């Protein structure tokens, strides 16, 4: 089965153009699947049946896997078995009648405007890495881009004169996101003054660099966000996507068009963007008081 898995992973990388992070998630799911089948002495893919898969799912649930993780696991193995049939590696698909568990799609905590401002103002602008961190935080909130997109930004992707950034998202899909005056000011200083000091003797077009002149990792940016969150005394749980969620929520709360927000976020399905249309109770009360004739 290992050979078929590798063929499948090659297929989704080349044919579907999925990101390395997504492929990594597929690989981890299929490794769990293969390990379980090996433990149960399954030597061929056609020996797998629906009952065995359900037992595998029960094993994952016993390990504490969430409903969301189980749903993704089922999606992965379903796609894998469909590939196996299409490529003549298997004669049957044991996932045909398999149901995915339902789970609530919930957003992580969203920061309010005051909390965002507190977070943005935390880095020390008198330090090189502090100015860089402030610029990254400003850019994340100004554009709603993913951290994985931020770390791959190159100089040529930023047009400060026209005021936009070219972002390459999942599957290398390109989108143009406008920039506001505040983030343009920080980017200008960073590119002209701060980045050359970080660059040193390194030759790279990557926009954001660490103190050794190398591209920053996702883990480094996540750590930076969490540390600044603590300094800003923010009690909510911060994740690499917190500013992205806050960006979308604040736009929609202030009347932005859902389709425009979908475009800026790079969502292929508008139902994903609709998750952000939750409005706080205070916002609902404010809208009611403002617009209802008998309020």
From Swiss-Prot:
Enzyme active site: 146, 170, 241, 244, 267, 276
Broad class of the protein's primary localization: cytoplasm
Cross-referenced CDD domains: INT_XerDC_C
Segments forming domain Tyr recombinase: 106-289
One annotated GO molecular function: tyrosine-based site-specific recombinase activity
GO biological process: cell division; chromosome segregation; DNA transposition
Keywords: Cell cycle, Cell division, Chromosome partition, Cytoplasm, DNA integration, DNA recombination, DNA-binding
Coiled coil regions, renumbered to chain: none
Domain Core-binding (CB): 1-85
Intrachain disulfide bonds: none
Annotated Pfam families: Phage_int_SAM_1, Phage_integrase
InterPro entries cross-referenced by the UniProt entry: CB, DNA_brk_join_enz, Integrase-like_cat_sf, Integrase_catalytic, Integrase_recombinase_N, Integrase_SAM-like_N, Recomb_XerD, Tyrosine_recombinase_XerC/XerD
SUPFAM superfamilies, sorted: DNA breaking-rejoining enzymes (SSF56349)
Subcellular localization(s) per the UniProt record: Cytoplasm
Cellular component per GO, a single term: cytoplasm
This protein's record includes keyword Cell cycle: yes
NCBIfam families linked: PRK00283.1, recomb_XerA_Arch, recomb_XerD
Record-stated family: Belongs to the 'phage' integrase family. XerD subfamily.
Function of the protein: Site-specific tyrosine recombinase, which acts by catalyzing the cutting and rejoining of the recombining DNA molecules. The XerC-XerD complex is essential to convert dimers of the bacterial chromosome into monomers to permit their segregation at cell division. It also contributes to the segregational stability of plasmids.
Quaternary structure and interacting proteins, as annotated: Forms a cyclic heterotetrameric complex composed of two molecules of XerC and two molecules of XerD.
Name recorded for this polypeptide: Tyrosine recombinase XerD
Native source organism of the sequence: Staphylococcus aureus (strain Mu50 / ATCC 700699)
